[in-house]
Amino acid sequence: MARATARPWFYSSELASVYDFPPGDGAGQTVAIIEFGGGYFPNDLKQFCQYAGVAVPKVDTISLHNAPTNKKDGAEDEVMLDIEVVAGVCPKAKIAVYFSKFTEQGWIDAIDAAVHDAVRQPSVVSISWGWAEDDSWSTGAIDAINESLKDAALLGVTVCVASGDDGSDDGIGDGHAHCDFPASSPYVLAVGGTSLRVENGKPVEKTWKDGDGLRKDGGGATGGGVSTHFARPQWQKVSVKSVNPGSIQGRVIPDVAADASASTGYFTVVDGQAGAIGGTSAAAPLWAALIARVNAKLPSGKRVGYLAPMLYQKVSKKTIGATSCRDITTGDNISAAIGGYRAKKGFDAVTGWGVPIGSKLAAAIAGQV
């Protein structure tokens, strides 16, 4: 997550228009959001919805491990960003926010609680949290959390995860390139970031990288690269090589992207103050809101489900990702000494297949589920 210091900014509803989301308000859907700090503040959401001109959605907060749901510890920026992005696009959807502790068991319980919630029954989950997979995570923790994400995929629940905001370095600073987990899990839709302007009514977009790509230096960049933990899934037939010497042929992230630059950020209200925030942690809930709209249009009993593999399937010689996303071909996420990754024609490790063309994605999904 990164704060914008200047305009332009967008309401999430405006981005839904830029990205040609199918019409709708998310009625009948529940979007789950997983948080590990901060809190939900109804007055902020009410004020946001007044600015955005949308109805105030119903929000449920669920505490796990006695985690507070209304704490002001700095992470409320993240919580309110996630909720407000979804609210702007799907004001008639229910939003369920699961608060837990940032521990291995806390992660597992939060994902399990959302995926197996028989009362709220979310069809899509948004996660804006993570850390470099080969830094503070243990192998056991990654594998255990990944099993919970696998359960989500098997149950047809789409999990959208932010790919990180510090470029190829991922905030580690050891000279090597890193991937964020759980974005690197093969069972999630990993969401990267772009920098978006609208000129003469048309989007102009490139890979998100502000400054040197590191938040500690006042910049930021989309996370993305090649996993050192997860082998490349059979369904991910792409030609991307790790910049780390001797690395495995791992899972490549992100799968897709959306606006994330702090300088072209998302309008939010936090602690009573209106402003703009960016980061892939805004792009992930935007994709979750898109999926909620798509789910609302599908026949009863059908939903998007495990989306990532579908994007790599070929239909009439082109992948669904290529036909359902607008390709981003400029920019890079280089922030590590070893290097990073560049956008190119087709799939790449900075914006994946690109940003959504929502109506085309909805049509493609309808033909597959």
Where are these regions (language model features)?
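Short acidic, Gly/Pro-enriched loop/turn segments at secondary-structure junctions
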Residues: 197-204
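Walker A/P-loop NTP-binding active-site region of P-loop NTPases
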Residues: 290
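Substrate-binding/charge-relay-adjacent region of secreted/lumenal peptidase catalytic domains
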Residues: 1-193, 222-223, 227-279, 284, ...
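An often Trp-containing, charged/polar helix-loop segment at the C-terminal end
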Residues: 195, 240-245, 294-349, 369
